[in-house]
C-alpha cells in the first residue's frame, strides 16, 4: 500500500517542489 505523493517523506522544502516539508512530509 502506498500513500499519496502529497505525503511523501522529505527533509527539506526543496524536495516537495511547490509544497512545504512539514513533520517530514510534503503538504
Swiss-Prot record:
Belongs to the u18-CNTX family. It is found in: Secreted. This is U18-ctenitoxin-Co1b. GO terms for cellular component: extracellular region. Disulfide bonds: none annotated. Not toxic to mice by intracerebroventricular injection. Expressed by the venom gland. Keywords: Secreted.
